[in-house]
């Protein structure tokens, strides 16, 4: 059987009531002018800066880099570049060529004719003169002249620029990610 519960008045000063701390009250008689520990901690955090300047700069930098890499990715996915290049494929049974806007490099034309002449490779015992001679004119154009005196002009735009541009676009996303991780690690140390 439980002992009877003694009810104390709010102004009681007995030994049981005087030992209680005012912050442990859970009833409505608590004094609201004294802030609780939780309220004091929350107010202290609200007055301080929530984000450091380094964190904000890092987030802005990463956002700009991700946006830039996303734009480059979308641009590289477009099919506009395929029409700029010339595709040539030849084996012993078929020839496939798709002409683009840019002209063929004279070295590529020489390689094609060499393959047509020697499909299994160049045999050193057979020596022939070159069928095509490459000459540079003053107008910065390349002239290919053949044995039958046909002349074909090829503009001086190097084909390597398209290859370098494609490689640069492929490696750009990896470079952006690597630089972002490096800058993030450097800012995290500070």
Swiss-Prot record:
Its main location: host cell. It is a multi-pass membrane protein. It comes from the Viruses. One of its GO terms (cellular component) is host cytoskeleton. Keywords: Host cell junction, Host cytoplasm, Host cytoskeleton, Host endoplasmic reticulum, Host membrane, Membrane, Phosphoprotein, Transmembrane, Transmembrane helix, Transport, Viral movement protein. GO terms for biological process: transport of virus in host, cell to cell. It is found in: Host cell junction, Host plasmodesma; Host endoplasmic reticulum membrane; Host cytoplasm, Host cytoskeleton. Residues 1-52, 188-190 are cytoplasmic. InterPro entries: Viral_beta_CD. It holds the Pfam family Viral_Beta_CD. Residues 74-166 are lumenal. The chain crosses the membrane at residues 53-73, 167-187. The modification Phosphotyrosine is found at residues 89, 120. A motif (Involved in plasmodesmata targeting and virus cell-to-cell movement) lies at residues 89-93. Interacts with movement protein TGB2. TGB1-TGB3-TGB2 complex formation is enhanced by ATP hydrolysis. Participates in the transport of viral genome to neighboring plant cells directly through plasmodesmata, without any budding. TGBp2 and TGBp3 are necessary for intracellular delivery of TGBp1-containing vRNPs to plasmodesmata. Can gate plasmodesmata and increase their size exclusion limit. Induces host actin cytoskeleton network thickening, which probably plays a major role in virus cell-to-cell movement. The 2nd transmembrane domain is involved in plasmodesmata targeting. Belongs to the virgaviridae TGB3 movement protein family. This is Movement protein TGB3. It comes from Potato mop-top virus (isolate Potato/Sweden/Sw) (PMTV).
């Amino acid at each position: 059987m439980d002992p009877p519960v003694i009810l104390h008045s709010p102004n009681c000063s007995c030994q049981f009531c005087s030992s209680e701390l005012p912050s442990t009250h859970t009833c409505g008689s608590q004094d609201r002018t004294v802030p609780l520990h939780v309220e004091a901690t929350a107010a202290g955090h609200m007055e301080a800066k929530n984000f450091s300047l380094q964190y904000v700069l890092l987030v802005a930098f990463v956002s700009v880099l991700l946006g830039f890499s996303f734009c480059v990715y979308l641009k590289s996915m477009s099919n506009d570049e395929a029409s700029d290049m010339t595709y040539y494929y030849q084996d012993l049974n078929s020839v496939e060529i798709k002409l683009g806007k840019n002209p063929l490099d004279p070295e590529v034309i020489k390689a094609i004719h060499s393959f047509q002449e020697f499909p299994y490779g160049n045999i050193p015992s057979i020596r022939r003169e070159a069928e095509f001679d490459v000459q540079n004119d003053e107008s910065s154009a390349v002239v290919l002249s053949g044995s039958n005196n046909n002349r074909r002009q090829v503009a001086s735009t190097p084909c390597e620029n398209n290859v370098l541009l494609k490689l640069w676009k492929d490696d750009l996303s990896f470079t952006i990610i690597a630089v972002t991780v490096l800058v993030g690690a450097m800012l995290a140390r500070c």
